[in-house]
Curated annotation (Swiss-Prot):
InterPro entries: Urease_gamma, Urease_gamma/gamma-beta_su, Urease_gamma_sf, Urease_subunit. GO terms for molecular function: nickel cation binding; urease activity. The keyword Repeat does not apply. PANTHER family: UREASE. Gene3D superfamilies: Urease, gamma-like subunit. It holds the Pfam family Urease_gamma. It is an enzyme of class 3 (hydrolase). GO terms for biological process: urea catabolic process. The keyword Hydrolase applies. Disulfide bonds: none annotated. Its EC number is 3.5.1.5. This is Urease subunit gamma. Pathway: Nitrogen metabolism; urea degradation; CO(2) and NH(3) from urea (urease route): step 1/1.
Length: 100
């Protein structure tokens, strides 16, 4: 399989998000990279599904709570940004304070 660097990066994000989701399902608290991967994957898939930037900015804040992540992670994670491909082109999606 021949993947471009961009495709490799997207695949890595989705694999990391899958690992994070499995750990969360087992009751483990997520670390920083796992939390970022889970939120980023949600944003990428939402864009692929045709959701709007505004919808994703709101839903990106509902995925994780303080109880889902290790201590100190909400304070470390101020923004999650990703360039996502929407039906009408690529757009930057920013989720401010994604863990509430």
């Amino acid at each position: 399989m021949q993947l471009t660097p961009h495709e490799q990066e997207r695949l890595l994000i989705h694999v990391a998000a899958d690992v994070a989701e499995k750990r969360r399902a087992r009751g483990l608290r997520l670390n920083h990279p796992e939390a970022v991967a889970l939120i980023t994957s949600h944003l990428l898939e939402g864009a692929r599904d045709g959701r709007t930037v505004a919808e994703l900015m709101v839903s990106g804040r509902t995925l994780l709570t303080r109880d889902d992540v290790m201590e100190g992670i909400p304070e470390m994670l101020h923004d999650v940004q990703v360039e996502a491909t929407f039906p009408d082109g690529t757009k930057l999606v920013t989720v401010h304070d994604p863990i509430v």
